[in-house]
Amino acid sequence: MRAVLTWRDKAEHCINDIAFKPDGTQLILAAGSRLLVYDTSDGTLLQPLKGHKDTVYCVAYAKDGKRFASGSADKSVIIWTSKLEGILKYTHNDAIQCVSYNPITHQLASCSSSDFGLWSPEQKSVSKHKSSSKIICCSWTNDGQYLALGMFNGIISIRNKNGEEKVKIERPGGSLSPIWSICWNPSSRWESFWMNRENEDAEDVIVNRYIQEIPSTLKSAVYSSQGSEAEEEEPEEEDDSPRDDNLEERNDILAVADWGQKVSFYQLSGKQIGKDRALNFDPCCISYFTKGEYILLGGSDKQVSLFTKDGVRLGTVGEQNSWVWTCQAKPDSNYVVVGCQDGTISFYQLIFSTVHGLYKDRYAYRDSMTDVIVQHLITEQKVRIKCKELVKKIAIYRNRLAIQLPEKILIYELYSEDLSDMHYRVKEKIIKKFECNLLVVCANHIILCQEKRLQCLSFSGVKEREWQMESLIRYIKVIGGPPGREGLLVGLKNGQILKIFVDNLFAIVLLKQATAVRCLDMSASRKKLAVVDENDTCLVYDIDTKELLFQEPNANSVAWNTQCEDMLCFSGGGYLNIKASTFPVHRQKLQGFVVGYNGSKIFCLHVFSISAVEVPQSAPMYQYLDRKLFKEAYQIACLGVTDTDWRELAMEALEGLDFETAKKAFIRVQDLRYLELISSIEERKKRGETNNDLFLADVFSYQGKFHEAAKLYKRSGHENLALEMYTDLCMFEYAKDFLGSGDPKETKMLITKQADWARNIKEPKAAVEMYISAGEHVKAIEICGDHGWVDMLIDIARKLDKAEREPLLLCATYLKKLDSPGYAAETYLKMGDLKSLVQLHVETQRWDEAFALGEKHPEFKDDIYMPYAQWLAENDRFEEAQKAFHKAGRQREAVQVLEQLTNNAVAESRFNDAAYYYWMLSMQCLDIAQDPAQKDTMLGKFYHFQRLAELYHGYHAIHRHTEDPFSVHRPETLFNISRFLLHSLPKDTPSGISKVKILFTLAKQSKALGAYRLARHAYDKLRGLYIPARFQKSIELGTLTIRAKPFHDSEELVPLCYRCSTNNPLLNNLGNVCINCRQPFIFSASSYDVLHLVEFYLEEGITDEEAISLIDLEVLRPKRDDRQLEIANNSSQILRLVETKDSIGDEDPFTAKLSFEQGGSEFVPVVVSRLVLRSMSRRDVLIKRWPPPLRWQYFRSLLPDASITMCPSCFQMFHSEDYELLVLQHGCCPYCRRCKDDPGP
């Protein structure tokens, strides 16, 4: 840093205070009793302002630039406009010591010896507050919320906008350390910078990629570049990056200068940050730069010093002849103004020089004057090293980093050999003050440049070697070498260029030119030397011959490519110039200085930052390609070119028959197609092919240069390849030129290819015609089939010979797919493929044609009826499916289908369907029972399934009643059903049937109908069962309420036995039979009332046909005096009507038979003779005409006037009116689902 005096002036009186206009164009000085207004650009006094009667002590400008204020010993404050006009004046009781504008609200604080006042343009009066001591200085926080007051008694008082004290800070010196100047830091992102600094020495630095500070205790300690993000700043941000306002409100830092000759820093809360810093003089003024990065401090030492924001002294801005009472930095610039006791006004420009070092991809530079940032140009990683002292010089080489501080040199090393490692640690310290122009570091040495002299020092500070030059040294660069024996390239002002080895006392003169050296670089192989002289000319020499190879103008820096011997770049005049070998220079716009060139990356320094610019090497590559230097062009391309450039290189090399280079280039762009071509050419070369025309023809054909390829094919004697190429390309007009002399195979091939082309370009009809003419019927059929051209398909099928089975079969397949079964059948018949014809009928469900074909060819019976049966089953036509299964002889499959349907219905609680399927199963078993071998087994299953069908049919109503919110059945019906189920359930309850639901329904309906005894019995039974939660409450309530009912059942509900006229109890232990005569009750399949029917049996020897014929005879009723006879034996008791010659009378023999009282506990069936049968009326008899092997069942109605209907299919009994209603509702029998119009069995 150095300060340049811009202008200076001298006033008659002491300069007490200074204020800049916010835009920096004007400067307001408090001198004597006047205000002096200066133009900052040239120091011209614009206007003196008069208004005060005594010395003006202070002046302040509002942030909006509209007003400024001045305070004087005359106890008054004057408000001035930016047009230098006074607009307001108010007074205090004492002299005004300081004034300050709120940066946000523009409220003015004015402080005197005894009080301070707050004024704003919106207020008419000034609010004043008393002070315990004389106020010397004041300052607002960045957000304008708090005002800090510095007092003569050493106290700092922090007040809010209303003047109320919030924080009080007492300095150790008390009244012996008056607070002479205070200032809030405009930047607030550095608070954590101070947190761990109290016990740190200057040389113990903190290295952290993310600017997190960790104390260092040992010289050999390792500092990691990994860490958490710090609060004050990001590693990549510079000081001029945007601030976070919210963070600023929390972390305002107050700098305090007192006459205890100390500088200290405080947080807004009053907590001190770090230790006090001794000054050794009385400070009179302290102020920050606009962005808070530096502090200006002046006082009794008669100079202004520049400090870092943490209080580290950096240097002197300007020395004066008297005390410095005020100093300020011009807003947003590096200009500083100083006001002195003797009236001197000095205006300085601060110039911050760039201190940096570069080695390959590592760049180190100074930041904030006391920090060093090392940047990895490839990975963009950064690490900050905090030195806490002014950084004077930086040098970097391989894993070494040297930093020169005012009193020492620190040498760092990388922790590991990893190329991307950013872990630095202190290796050595040279505690000695050095003055040098340039600093260079090697593996084990430090090189100092002092004008004409070079000194080589070890890391311990011992001078090992010294070189004295003839002229001033202008440039030094380490060019590498073994550790301890590195070579240096030195350029002198007299044009001499030398090479010096660290371990050699003698310098080697490489060459000497007429002009002074500005920049140097040596090529990777050390055979060429590039020099930039003071005339901005880049000169390139051959080191061995000292010959000037070429020179280029407009250069200020130069760098050789570290990966390519013949490439260099230089910058100048706002352009970047890239030169390859002796080719012309390629130029592009670029600001800055070239400092390195590695592959395709050019490192450019612009102002204070360095950046890696990715520069495609396309231009030099094409220069090599123009001269057919493919291998050299490939080397250039490896440095970095676009994919398009790689492809161009590959194509050029391929046409130049440089297959090796072309192969490498195509690998780069991953073009497998061309790689296969090159591979095939290499294989052919290995087999001895040497015809380059043929190779080049293949290349041209791949590149799309077909006519050139055809000419080369023809020239090389391979016309067939040209024909094949044009055919594949569908360029048939050109292909005909290469046809042989009427070769039918080639002609057919050409037509086929043309048809393929027509097919691909969506001309299918033309393609079909071409395929037919070429004899490719299969392909023609495929096109017709894909486009649904049925007419063309059948036309082709009819023209084909029946021996051509493959195209005919394909035709039939497409016709079937296109829903033209008639044409498909015609094709199958032409082929004689009857099995496929049967399959066609089955798949298209043309059952009539299939059955007709099956009649003619019985061998296809299974192929027809099995699919038919499955189709019927899928369409819920189970009766027909069963017949089909039977017809196919697949009884087991029929039973399996029904069993599966039944199980599914039970599992899904579809009990009505389950009953229907069980009935069908029973009828299936009855049909199978006709086989004598399976008769007994099947009859057992028949009765079992019949019983299950009856149970599930009844339980369906119970289930719906308990699950649905509304019931469609009358209470009497639900009562009868639940009684029927309770008496009928076997010991093992069938799957899906719930005893709880049956008993719950029985209890509920019994209670409703007056059968209280039966209801109590049902509730008692329920207590022994597991009750679902949803029934629990109802059952508990019913159990309690039934106790209040009488313990008997209503007589109206008691069932009557129509054989013996006995009243049976509602709860019958014997089941659904009479307790007296054991006659089974016959129930209605809808209401489950006991029907007035009695089953009777035929005497032995009477066949079913004879019985029917006897019943159909209409005879007179027998007379009342006919006798009834009883024949008894030891084994059984049989009631028989004896036929005598006088037996015909008025009394009905059957009725008389039923009224006979029998004894014993065994059931005695009613057996009738021919006479009794003859006496019966056909209207009173119901017959269940079971198919064999079962016998028919006969039932006699005892109340002929009450009509009963029996379903002719399932033989279930109904009240006639119930049956008719149900058939009207459902259109079929509710039990077996036989439709009304279906014929009987």
Curated annotation (Swiss-Prot):
Tissue: Expressed in many tissues. Predominant expression in testis and pituitary.
Skewed-composition ranges (Acidic residues): 229-242
Effect of mutating residue 570 to C: In CED1; uncertain significance
Outcome, altering residue 391 to L: In CED1; uncertain significance
Substitution effect: residue 495 to R: In CED1; strongly decreases interaction with ITF43:WDR35
Outcome reported for the amino acid change (mutating residue 322 to F): In CED1; no effect on interaction with ITF43:WDR35
InterPro entries linked to this entry: Beta-prop_IFT122_1st, Beta-prop_IFT122_2nd, Ift122/121, WD40/YVTN_repeat-like_dom_sf, WD40_repeat_dom_sf, WD40_rpt, Zn_ribbon_IFT122
Residue segments, region Disordered: 222-246
Pfam families reported in the protein's UniProt record: Beta-prop_IFT122_1st, Beta-prop_IFT122_2nd, TPR_IFT122, Zn_ribbon_IFT122, Zn_ribbon_IFT122_C
Subcellular location: Cell projection, Cilium; Cytoplasm, Cytoskeleton, Cilium basal body
Domain notes: Forms the trimeric core subcomplex IFT122:IFT140:WDR19 via the C-terminal region, whereas it interacts with IFT43:WDR35 via the N-terminal region containing the WD repeats.
PANTHER family given in the database record: INTRAFLAGELLAR TRANSPORT PROTEIN 122 HOMOLOG, WD REPEAT DOMAIN-RELATED
Medical condition linked: Cranioectodermal dysplasia 1: A disorder characterized by craniofacial, skeletal and ectodermal abnormalities. Clinical features include dolichocephaly (with or without sagittal suture synostosis), scaphocephaly, short stature, limb shortening, short ribs, narrow chest, brachydactyly, renal failure and hepatic fibrosis, small and abnormally shaped teeth, sparse hair, skin laxity and abnormal nails.
The name this protein goes by in its record: Intraflagellar transport protein 122 homolog
Source organism: Homo sapiens (Human)
Lineage start: Eukaryota, Metazoa, Chordata, Craniata, Vertebrata
